Amino acid sequence: MKESKLLPFLRSQTQGELLARLFLNPDREFTLSALARAIGSSIPGVHHEVERLYNAGYINERREGRNRLVRARMDSVIVEPLTTLLALSYGPIPVIEAALTGAKGITQVFIFGSWAKRYSGETGGVPNDIDLGVIGSASTDELEDLLEDAKKILGREIDIKKFTTSSWNEGSSMIDEIKSSPHYFLKIK
């Protein structure tokens, strides 16, 4: 089991990422397979963590055909402090994905810098600002507007670096450095 580097008192990275998906998206229901895809884990691993959370009373579930849909229970006294911890430690991926889903003019989005290093398993302190690369035609002003609430939720600045598709493909010293360092592509729909 891969240990958590972002919030080390959690049992595993899977547990932290699962909690972040659920509690930072409280209005959404997830199937176990969607959760597994989103966090890059196996369905049995997600099933195990979901069972623990359900049995402890932290999530709700319902069935829709063969699908088991789960969502965070927001009526517990632990929700506010847990959500704050998750936003500060695991938050950038699910919060930014939610903020940019459906946005026009975005081809790809990725996190790089110290947050990407933590996601790739490098140890170190909790990162400060979030380095976000955006490939596409959306303007920086549009992106800033879309990410305003995400900044508040995360309690961090988001430093946006914009690239056109052609500039990303052609490369530059900065792009080459990003490509050769840890970077994490987000799943934007």
Regions found by a protein language model. Give the residues of each.
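Active-site glycine-centered loops adjacent to acidic/histidine catalytic or metal-binding residues
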Residues: G113
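Catalytic core of pol beta-like nucleotidyltransferases
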Residues: K2-E51, N55-Q108, A116-P127, I135-K189
